[in-house]
């Protein structure tokens, strides 16, 4: 399977990137700032916050942060804060995505999966509204969508 092989190659490349450690409560990314960096979770746990509200907690190694800022050339749209001591592989985002097709494929696959899941949740939400589902059921679907939009999950070989 090509993606599995590419993930193995990507993991080997990640081992060549610097690793940065963040302590509990330390800010990893700050909304409104530009860092130009892609951060790939090596180990630990972080929370993603939008306007001070936690929209996701991420513990999965391989999760990517900062990709939207790099791809759209805009400031970060969320705060990311360490929930426990966390380590990240750090890469210059623009350089990595421009010269490394495997890195680009990895980020594109993550974004495509997130978009597909968000689209499915939107369909579910529309059905719930049309059929008059209870408000708490609709709220659960909205929360699910917020999680999908708030975090970038790693690609795994299936």
State each model region's role:
Residues 1-158:
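Cytosolic regulatory regions built on CNB/CRP/Popeye-like sensor folds
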């Amino acid at each position: 399977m090509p993606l599995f092989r590419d993930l193995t190659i990507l993991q080997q490349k990640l081992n060549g990137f610097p690793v940065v450690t963040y302590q509990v409560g330390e800010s990893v990314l700050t909304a409104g700032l530009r860092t130009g960096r892609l951060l790939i979770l090596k180990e630990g746990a972080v929370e993603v916050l939008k306007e001070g509200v936690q929209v996701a907690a991420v513990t999965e190694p391989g999760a990517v942060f900062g990709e939207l800022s790099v791809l759209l050339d805009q400031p970060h749209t969320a705060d990311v804060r360490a929930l426990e001591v966390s380590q990240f592989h750090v890469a210059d985002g623009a350089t990595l995505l421009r010269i490394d097709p495997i890195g680009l494929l990895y980020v594109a696959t993550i974004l495509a999966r997130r978009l597909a899941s968000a689209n499915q949740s939107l369909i579910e939400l529309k059905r719930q509204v049309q059929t008059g589902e209870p408000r708490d059921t609709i709220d659960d679907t909205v929360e699910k969508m917020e999680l999908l939009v708030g975090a970038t999950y790693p690609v795994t070989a299936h």
